[in-house]
Each structure stands twice: as C-alpha cells, then as structure tokens.
A protein has these predicted regions:
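Glycine-rich phosphate-binding P-loop
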Residues: 19, 31-54, 176
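Short beta-strand-centered segment that lines the nucleotide-binding/catalytic pocket of NTP-utilizing
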Residues: 36, 56-71
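N-terminal pre-Walker A segment at the start of P-loop NTPase domains
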Residues: 1-24, 175
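Conserved beta-strand segments of the P-loop GTPase G domain that flank and frequently precede/overlap
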Residues: 34-36, 64, 86-87, 108
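Short, basic, glycine/proline-bearing loop/turn elements
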Residues: 49, 53-62, 127
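Accessory recognition modules or surfaces
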Residues: 13-29, 75-83
Length: 176
C-alpha cells in the first residue's frame, strides 16, 4: 500500500496558553466529528482504531498528539478521498462552526458514571490546580524571555551578525 501515516503534535503549550491547529484542520475537512465529554474514555485508542480502519481502506492518515500525555492521540485526520477529522474537543474546548452540515458533535456525557466522578472531586481539583500552575509558570517564563530579548537586542552587533552569515553562506556554497 502506498498510503502514509504521519504523526504531529496538534497543540503547543505556550506562555500565552494553548495554541492549536484544530480550527485549520476543521476548515480543511469535509466532515468533522467533535467528541465531547469528560476525559478517560480511552479516546486515544478510538482515534487509533479509526485511523487503522481508514488506513486499511487506502487513505492517508494524520495523527495529532497531546503534548502533555505521552502517546495520547487527540485527533485523527483521514485524508482524501474522505477528508474526515475526528477530534477530541473537550480540552481545549472546540465548538462546531457548521453544526449539522460539516460538523457533528458526539456527546460522551451519557457514558459518565457520575458517582465515580464525584468520588474523585478532590483529584479533579488537584489536577486543575497543577494545570493552572503550569500555565502561570509558562507565562512567567515568556515574560522573562521577552525581557532578556529586549536587553540582548540593545547590545547586538547586527553588522557583525550579517558578516558572519555571509561568511557561512560563502563557506557552504562558495562565491556567488
């Protein structure tokens, strides 16, 4: 088979919060399935099975991974001729744009054992606290980086940088 499987990270954790490519992928897709509900539904395994199914039918597959959880697939994009995106859309929350046309929401809330969930309220709150600490630390780190960048640029010898770049190009490719 000539079809390919490609692996990407679908989001990045930055000082400004989570940045992701999912809106762009939704715009590229002909059909979008947004899977919404509490975490823990083994969605990654479902995403993998969906990819395997369509790969066996000859489609190219793109898997998009969560940067926080090792080997956790957040989205599976089945390329032509299907152009179908399956996306875990709870965190980050992604809402349908063309509900009922291109976008279809699959609610997993009916699968939740509310007693089990409520028994773990403290753990859920702890997770949220660490999540907020993580992004506060990233925001602080980007502020420090930006401050250093301002100071560094004040003392930069831009002409010297240009000269070094020109020397590198000459060394690699010879004279023009």
């Amino acid at each position: 088979m000539g079809n390919t499987v490609t692996h990407f990270f679908g989001q990045a954790l930055t000082g400004q919060g989570i940045k992701n490519v999912y809106k762009d992928l939704m715009n590229e897709a002909k059909t979008v399935y947004l899977l919404k509900g509490a975490h823990g539904f083994h969605l990654s395994a479902i995403m993998k099975k969906l990819g395997d199914y369509y790969h066996d039918k000859g489609a190219d597959i793109e898997y998009f991974y969560d940067p926080l959880f090792d080997k956790t697939i957040e989205a599976t994009f089945v390329k032509a001729p299907y152009n179908t995106l399956f996306l875990q859309a709870t965190n980050p929350s992604i809402e349908p744009v063309f509900l009922g046309e291109r976008d279809h929401v699959i609610s997993l809330d009916d699968c939740v054992d509310e007693q089990q969930l409520s028994a773990n309220t403290e753990l859920i709150q702890t997770k949220q606290t660490y999540y907020e600490k993580c992004f506060n630390a990233l925001a602080n780190a980007i502020r420090i980086h930006d401050d250093w960048e301002v100071e560094t640029q004040k003392h930069m010898n831009w002409r010297g940088l240009d000269d070094q770049y020109a020397a590198l190009v000459t060394n690699l490719f010879g004279q023009n």
